[in-house]
């Protein structure tokens, strides 16, 4: 829902699909049966997916912070609060990148709509030329990938620590068992409740960034199709030349004779 969105973009404070310029351009493309309609709609759908996923991640981290208030272990609580703060910073960074992307989309739509008023449907042919979204989309994709990899590395470190901790515990227990003449324990216990708590924020971040990356790649694919379609369309100058070439033979034909003797 729109009320849940806490971030804004440089062109609007509303979700991208509800922006007036975006809605107007989508309606215009559909009304004129433009081949660009489907790909532009997919691009907007992918950006909406990014908005929604960031909104979910913000809610998840807020819920985790509430749970931490009930935690009794002060050292663990402080560590998890620090983790949440770091991940909130990562999300804020992605919100900023998304904000810049949305601003460019809105600005591009505004230019296309203005150009349409001057040149008509020809303005709809070069959609990708007005949008200039590739650098902004790549920034979102790369940022999401970097944060996702950082979360993976953090979880691997946690698993390694927990494994070493339980392995050390197993050796200590086996020493006691040996002294009592009992069989040693062969396997260490798996990570327990603490490991689950510590990894939870990283899991949420990894899921969020994975979805962000996937949506950015979908948007880039849609943009690439728009660019390819624009390359294959004849330019205005080429269209004028083709039209002139069709009219040229008619100009060169001799005018019909009006001589009485020729009838």
Protein language model features and the residues they cover:
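Gram-negative host-targeted secretion-system effectors, predominantly Type III and Type IV
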Residues: 1-261
């Amino acid at each position: 829902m729109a009320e849940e969105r806490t971030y804004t973009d440089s062109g609007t404070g509303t979700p991208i699909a509800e922006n007036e310029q975006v809605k107007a351009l989508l309606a215009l493309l559909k009304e004129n049966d433009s081949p660009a309609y489907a790909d532009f709609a997919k691009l907007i759908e992918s950006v909406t997916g990014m908005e929604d996923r960031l909104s979910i991640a913000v809610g998840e981290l807020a819920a985790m912070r509430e749970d931490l208030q009930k935690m009794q272990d002060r050292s663990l609580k402080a560590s998890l609060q620090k983790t949440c703060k770091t991940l909130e910073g990562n999300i804020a960074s992605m919100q900023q990148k998304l904000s810049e992307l949305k601003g460019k989309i809105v600005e591009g739509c505004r230019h296309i709509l203005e150009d349409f008023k001057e040149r008509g449907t020809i303005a709809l042919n070069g959609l990708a030329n007005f949008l200039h979204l590739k650098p902004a989309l790549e920034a979102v994709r790369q940022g999401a990938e970097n944060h996702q990899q950082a979360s993976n590395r953090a979880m691997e470190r946690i698993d390694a620590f927990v494994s070493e901790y339980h392995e050390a515990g197993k050796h200590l227990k086996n020493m006691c068992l040996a002294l009592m003449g009992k069989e040693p324990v062969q396997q260490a216990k798996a990570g327990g409740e603490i490991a689950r708590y510590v990894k939870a924020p990283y899991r949420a971040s990894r899921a969020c960034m994975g979805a962000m990356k996937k949506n950015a790649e979908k948007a880039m694919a849609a943009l690439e199709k728009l660019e390819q379609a624009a390359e294959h369309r004849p330019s205005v100058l080429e269209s004028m030349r083709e039209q002139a070439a069709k009219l040229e033979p008619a100009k060169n034909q001799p005018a019909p004779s009006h001589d009485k003797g020729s009838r």
